[in-house]
């Protein structure tokens, strides 16, 4: 018998706030965290804007030595995980460490480490690379560092599915608790690749918006959309088996009730044109949760602001919900914080949980003229306030990776 899984802790580092409270205040206020790139000189780059994390000081979240052994994606992950763990009120002295684990992903890891050490090889020779180059670079170190910092000795893994990584991590952590492998899981995603090779690579792929006005660059579902804006940060949650959470008197934010994951088997970057793969992920999540399409109140879309994603995700929602798609509110958090790649699903799951808590669906900022081919309710022009019972979050990754989480208002 599957065990029920609830959300008991939230953590976030984002372009509009480095804690959940700061982030959610920014979301409610419609704050846009996109601006000129400050990390390097962009004079020769077509793309000059991104959604950078601002004012983050790693040593405020860990000791100096630990911080020096982590690249930004790992630092963001540890900071968000510590916030979520503290929020959940878990005392590891009272827990079996082998029943508490971590599944946190990063789509890329550290391109910065690759850049720095390749320059050393070219200029000074291979003997001059940082001895810690490999552990600084590899994407599993977000999960590894969280495990070390929090003393979690259970399942510790890393899912890499590009822009769906964070959502798959939360889904797989959900499964670990459902089937009895763990009682507590720290899950989500982290990313930081606003650097020369990251921006150049995505620009060459024609994936990024070349608009220089930060308010008009990430405009999901708008007829003038022309690409996504690169973002960074981390979104981490604590998932817990229901009876375990109740036994220790935990505050329960919401219940995670369904998870769907599919593959398009179609193209290395483009989602399937009929939306069937992403639509099936939503259907599977609803089926597991025992929820009908007409019960879905809100969908936090992948909504990247690229032509193909927004059009095909609209088709996917229609495939999954049928006639009920016309009544659901859809939005995109990427309109405010850009695309956090492997961290996107984690941060957007936090948005879904907070939306249920507050009965608040944020506006899709910047979007003013909805593409006629995207014909759903995208929360354009104003936020929506309504009681939310069932909410879905979608993530779609390069390679055809589709993932959907269904979270519901907690009831005994």
Where are the language model's segments positioned?
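Phosphate/pyrophosphate-binding loops at sites that engage ATP/ADP/AMP, CoA/4′-phosphopantetheine
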Residues: 84-96, 245-252, 282-298, 320-324
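Acyl-CoA/ACP chain-elongation machinery
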Residues: 181-226, 259-273, 303-310, 327-377
